[in-house]
Swiss-Prot record:
Originating species: Homo sapiens
Modified residues (Phosphoserine): 304
Tissue spec: Expressed in all tissues tested, including heart, brain, placenta, lung, liver, skeletal muscle, kidney and pancreas. Expressed in J.CaM1.6, HuT 78 and HeLa cell lines (at protein level).
GO molecular function per UniProt: CD4 receptor binding
InterPro entries attached to this UniProt entry: AB_hydrolase_1 (IPR000073), AB_hydrolase_fold (IPR029058), Maspardin (IPR026151)
Domain AB hydrolase-1 span(s) in chain numbering: 87-159
TM stretches of this protein: none
Alphabetized UniProt keyword annotations: Cytoplasm, Endosome, Golgi apparatus, Hereditary spastic paraplegia, Membrane, Neurodegeneration, Phosphoprotein
Protein name from the UniProt record: Maspardin
Record-linked PANTHER family: ACID CLUSTER PROTEIN 33, MASPARDIN
Functional note: May play a role as a negative regulatory factor in CD4-dependent T-cell activation.
Its membrane topology: Peripheral membrane protein
Gene (UniProt): SPG21
One GO cellular component term: trans-Golgi network transport vesicle
Location(s), subcellular: Cytoplasm, Cytosol; Membrane; Endosome membrane; Golgi apparatus, trans-Golgi network membrane
Amino acid sequence: MGEIKVSPDYNWFRGTVPLKKIIVDDDDSKIWSLYDAGPRSIRCPLIFLPPVSGTADVFFRQILALTGWGYRVIALQYPVYWDHLEFCDGFRKLLDHLQLDKVHLFGASLGGFLAQKFAEYTHKSPRVHSLILCNSFSDTSIFNQTWTANSFWLMPAFMLKKIVLGNFSSGPVDPMMADAIDFMVDRLESLGQSELASRLTLNCQNSYVEPHKIRDIPVTIMDVFDQSALSTEAKEEMYKLYPNARRAHLKTGGNFPYLCRSAEVNLYVQIHLLQFHGTKYAAIDPSMVSAEELEVQKGSLGISQEEQ
């Protein structure tokens, strides 16, 4: 049990990448926690947004791999926000504080929904250059919990944890998926009542994405085709919403592929970010991009333009 928590990779990550805490709101209790790794010269990094049960370190395998390839990566943990507008306003202030004009966002589950809402919120003065949506959704009504969204703040922590755990895989899983679930349960245990209640509120509060406001943003939809908390209908809705999105399909990986199928997830992230190499919105250090990769990028751009 708890293999990931005691793994050399995780311990090396915790020992080398500092966890920063930043306050951008008037309320001092609203603290953003984040890992910022890779070259600071990159002004359009990739930012990871976790699911309800996650902390910033659930993306440690992406941080280690992507920074090794020259990318700047930031993984976040949310303060306690109770509605989407408050979250979006706080996230905008955080980007201002970090002096980041535009960013790429990778959002897992709730993180993906919040990434879309932030892109929608800033559509008149865009802050989101691209989106990678992993096991995500575009309408909170799929959870049939909108009627309870206003009462999560009243519930004790053990009850909230029970609600979240109800979405974790209960059937047979392979050892890597079992380790990922153990790690996420451990992360869930580290969250306080208000953190959990606010995230569940954001996850279930009646809201949907307005696609016409973000239709020009490049999107990759990353889906897992075994047991995950998302229904097939929710996935189909995402495909309809983003008809031009790239699709990254993983045969297995459950709810947490970034932990148990990290090599595949990292490859799909690289493929997504490749389209921005050689531009001012590249998330990678230019010295790490080979001339050959730039040529491949130009070639693939030429092909996609011919197809249009």
